[in-house]
Amino acid sequence: MSEQANSSGIESLSNGLRERNAQTSKPIGDGEVTSQSLEDKLQIEEGDAADAEKKTFGRTPDGKVFTVPPTRDMVSQLLSPSEPKNISDIFVLAILGCHILLLWCLPSSFRIAAFAVIFLFWRASYNIGIGWLLHMQSNGRTLVCWAKKSNIFVNPSTGQNPHPTLYKMLKWELETKISEQYSFDEAPTEYNTWLVFRRVVDLILMCDFTSYCLFAIACGGRPAGESFIMLALRWTTGMSLVLFNLWVKLDAHRVVKDFAWYWGDFFYLIDQELTFDGVFEMAPHPMYSVGYAGYYGISLMAASYKVLFISILAHAAQFAFLVLVENPHIEKTYNVPPPRKRVAVDTDTKLQEDENSHEGSVVSDIANSAPVMPALQPVSMHNLLGLHNIDLYRSTDQSVLLAQLLFFALTTMTPSTPVYQFCFVLNAALWRIWYSVGIGYILNRQSNCKMWTRHFVKYGESNHEAWRQWKGTYHLSMTMTYASFIAAAWKMYSFPQDWGYGLVLLRHILGASLIALQIWTSSSIYESLGEFGWFFGDFFFDQSPKLTYSGIYRFLNNPERVLGLAGVWGAVLITSTKSLVFLALLSHTLTLAFIQLVERPHMQKLYGQSLRRDAGLVRSLKRSLPPSLKQIHGSVDKILDESFEFIEEFIEAARPKLATGVQTFVKDTSALFQKYPARVTISRLEPDLAGYDLKDYSITLEGTQPSQPAQFERASDKEGERARSMQFRRGEQENLIFEYGAPIKVKWTAPLNHSKKDWIGLYMVTDNTSREVTSVASQGRWIATNQASFDSETCEQGLISSDIVLKITREDCEPIDVASGEMVFSGDKLWWTQGVFEFRYHHNGKHNVMAVSRPFEIRIGRFDEDIVEADNYGLVRAAVEAALLPVVQNCFDRDPEIAPQTAEEHYGCLVERDGKYSKRVVFAVQHIVRADGNVRNLAWRICNAKKVLAPYSMSRSNGASTPTTEHED
């Protein structure tokens, strides 16, 4: 798969929050942009030009531009005698001293357990505590809201700060630390909040590392019977890993500075270029991957499995922190989809229809009316890889599942005698040979003479059919290769009798780590290449996309060359058998030959000079090598190239011929989790509601009414005879029925003295049995009635107005003044399903219900086929387009950047990246969305599907009914 292009998505700009220096920032808030623009800030006199180059300018979410003062790193601030110390520094040093004193005071029998608990506490404070704060800050700017709500950064002389002592302490603390270009009173709230946050981070990080080192000291020792050579080797390797870890941290801090080190862009952005340098060219997420090598070096020096296990646990927790906290924020901040190109209808999206030929066959109708799709590469509608893509209606998945079940049965039901072991090893070797040599030959012939595609074209099939068949062949071959290897490893493996004997436990740990490394590498390769690149799509479609190096390919040209086979060698470590060593050597040799003889020539032919010679890791290593070693490296490359050329000539002369198959199984059950997390009782009640009259509270709704057929579906022919007519209603109010996904405006009233922390939530009517207390979580479907009342900005999204005095007349004809307001529920604050719902007005941030709206129904209307002529394809398609367009717009939150304005307009890029949008449309329309690209293609797919199914339709108007047997005389 080498350096193949990524066929889908946009190259991610960063690999971790701490891995980037800065990014040209954009205001992401809704507040007013300050009139002092960045350009005005940069207009400095010529005499100050030298100083201006050193300045960094930050931008808050509301657009305010400020100068970011230079700051010192954590270790220098705390440990350097030349740095001024303040109360927080002394406090941190005192805590560290208490840790060291505790190690000296505790008896040896309690040290290990005590420091294990202490380290786990600080690690949880890091990954869970800091992670939660950053998550809340990223999604709702919670930390900044806390600061603004408490007014701790406001000068007490204004009379708005109720904490003057805290203000003075913070001002002295921060101005002592940052003496240049910084004013506590003039700095934005976001920057001051970040400075306070980083002091908390300093405490947690220093205590985390110190407690880990003390735990290693408590566990450290020398194994019985260890030789001096082994002792020296263990300490040399351990110290090397620690020094490497130290270099990684220092080089990373050199690149990203304090801004990214302390997650600065959760608070504000800085206007600088994005840079990747040094350690960031070597590995993805270096702070969290190779940056933890020192943990394993310390484990090696301590010679303790306890230290090793707790190191693995800490490392895993750090990766969870990366995946759950940093990566979502990076995607949201730095990888925003580009705006959709708004183009007029072109020939690529027009329907080639011939209404006069509609009387012909269904096949010809479909061919003539299909949208002309671009032939650059196939649109991936039904992926193969991944458990969530398993489709038991697909022959490929059926074949793979049956083959895996057969392998599992043979492996578990046969004895592990030498004869069976030999058969399983031979089977694994044959599958590996086929996977590399056979598949390699097919790809080589496809590259040179389009052999695979020509075969299918010869029998009247298209190149897309050849591509689908190839994917099945490769997929089955790959799964059978790894299944046979796993079966052979299982047959050769014997369960250890004594886990403490020798290096048995260490071998299993290292083996499992290598297997996990291969799984991660494979998933990273697939994430970078997509389905098109994974199955060597550029061998089948010449119009390949531009070559890009994203994801893992930023660091390695061919990650499968070494890391892609790490799991094979992990199995060798676990089993410790010569047979597995043979299979591993065979696999590695054939993989290298495949890359050199099949992939590399095709890539050079296809991409030519645009191919990168050295990846980021190689460039970094070459820069650090002396000239003599660089010459040796060049000589080795020359020898390898000549050897592979000889092998290539030999294989070209032999031309072996081999054949094919298919893979996968499982079903996605995530739909269950969409419904049941709300079934948790979380009620918080206000004990004193005296002084509030429930008659003053009210909720009224405004929304988009659905199409007329949706309102009359209840009175259909499937009901009883007396229920087929419209219901007679006493009174003026009609049933509230709103469109699926359409925004709903909520108007509320409340007493003038109502709490500023009141809020309105959206619920299913059946969720709450009580009308006085809400007993289930709103799951984010709520809006505050007043601004700045909660520690999050997401709860204010949709708020239009608050506390507008309105005079109303009660039922007892008494006129009174009440507070009123409006809000709009849309997007993620709506339920994306059908049902009956209600809004509830809650008091003072609790779950006491003060008012409940009228129940309303969300309904998806059925398309009325009787309003158009069934035989007129053009009219049917146009009617389907008109019916689909508003549904799709609602599902895309009516966002002009992603929602189409016409049937021909393509969806925005965010639809492909965030699956919730396509799932909404699939629920409403029950047809594939993402691959269609626009409403016109979706309508075409529906219309032609109806043509194919017309002979089986139960509707007399639109197709023949189910055939019945007639008795003839």
Curated annotation (Swiss-Prot):
<feature type="transmembrane region" description="Helical">
    <location>
        <begin position="400"/>
        <end position="420"/>
    </location>
</feature>
<feature type="transmembrane region" description="Helical">
    <location>
        <begin position="305"/>
        <end position="325"/>
    </location>
</feature>
<keyword id="KW-0444">Lipid biosynthesis</keyword>
<keyword id="KW-1208">Phospholipid metabolism</keyword>
<feature type="topological domain" description="Cytoplasmic">
    <location>
        <begin position="303"/>
        <end position="304"/>
    </location>
</feature>
<feature type="topological domain" description="Cytoplasmic">
    <location>
        <begin position="221"/>
        <end position="227"/>
    </location>
</feature>
<feature type="topological domain" description="Lumenal">
    <location>
        <begin position="249"/>
        <end position="281"/>
    </location>
</feature>
<feature type="transmembrane region" description="Helical">
    <location>
        <begin position="228"/>
        <end position="248"/>
    </location>
</feature>
<keyword id="KW-0949">S-adenosyl-L-methionine</keyword>
<feature type="topological domain" description="Lumenal">
    <location>
        <begin position="326"/>
        <end position="399"/>
    </location>
</feature>
<comment type="pathway">
    <text>Phospholipid metabolism; phosphatidylcholine biosynthesis.</text>
</comment>
<feature type="compositionally biased region" description="Basic and acidic residues">
    <location>
        <begin position="714"/>
        <end position="725"/>
    </location>
</feature>
<feature type="topological domain" description="Cytoplasmic">
    <location>
        <position position="421"/>
    </location>
</feature>
<keyword id="KW-1133">Transmembrane helix</keyword>
<feature type="topological domain" description="Lumenal">
    <location>
        <begin position="1"/>
        <end position="89"/>
    </location>
</feature>
<protein>
    <recommendedName>
        <fullName>Phosphatidylethanolamine N-methyltransferase</fullName>
        <ecNumber>2.1.1.17</ecNumber>
    </recommendedName>
</protein>
<dbReference type="GO" id="GO:0006656">
    <property type="term" value="P:phosphatidylcholine biosynthetic process"/>
</dbReference>
<feature type="transmembrane region" description="Helical">
    <location>
        <begin position="114"/>
        <end position="134"/>
    </location>
</feature>
<keyword id="KW-0256">Endoplasmic reticulum</keyword>
<feature type="topological domain" description="Cytoplasmic">
    <location>
        <begin position="111"/>
        <end position="113"/>
    </location>
</feature>
<keyword id="KW-0808">Transferase</keyword>
<feature type="transmembrane region" description="Helical">
    <location>
        <begin position="422"/>
        <end position="442"/>
    </location>
</feature>
<feature type="topological domain" description="Lumenal">
    <location>
        <begin position="520"/>
        <end position="564"/>
    </location>
</feature>
<keyword id="KW-0812">Transmembrane</keyword>
<dbReference type="InterPro" id="IPR007318">
    <property type="entry name" value="Phopholipid_MeTrfase"/>
</dbReference>
<feature type="topological domain" description="Cytoplasmic">
    <location>
        <begin position="586"/>
        <end position="969"/>
    </location>
</feature>
<feature type="topological domain" description="Lumenal">
    <location>
        <begin position="443"/>
        <end position="473"/>
    </location>
</feature>
<feature type="topological domain" description="Cytoplasmic">
    <location>
        <begin position="494"/>
        <end position="498"/>
    </location>
</feature>
<feature type="transmembrane region" description="Helical">
    <location>
        <begin position="565"/>
        <end position="585"/>
    </location>
</feature>
<feature type="topological domain" description="Lumenal">
    <location>
        <begin position="135"/>
        <end position="199"/>
    </location>
</feature>
<feature type="transmembrane region" description="Helical">
    <location>
        <begin position="282"/>
        <end position="302"/>
    </location>
</feature>
<dbReference type="GO" id="GO:0005789">
    <property type="term" value="C:endoplasmic reticulum membrane"/>
</dbReference>
<keyword id="KW-0594">Phospholipid biosynthesis</keyword>
<feature type="transmembrane region" description="Helical">
    <location>
        <begin position="499"/>
        <end position="519"/>
    </location>
</feature>
<dbReference type="InterPro" id="IPR016219">
    <property type="entry name" value="Phosphatid-EA_MeTrfase_fun"/>
</dbReference>
<keyword id="KW-0472">Membrane</keyword>
<keyword id="KW-0489">Methyltransferase</keyword>
<keyword id="KW-0443">Lipid metabolism</keyword>
<comment type="function">
    <text>Catalyzes the first step of the methylation pathway of phosphatidylcholine biosynthesis, the SAM-dependent methylation of phosphatidylethanolamine (PE) to phosphatidylmonomethylethanolamine (PMME).</text>
</comment>
<feature type="region of interest" description="Disordered">
    <location>
        <begin position="1"/>
        <end position="40"/>
    </location>
</feature>
<feature type="transmembrane region" description="Helical">
    <location>
        <begin position="200"/>
        <end position="220"/>
    </location>
</feature>
<feature type="region of interest" description="Disordered">
    <location>
        <begin position="705"/>
        <end position="725"/>
    </location>
</feature>
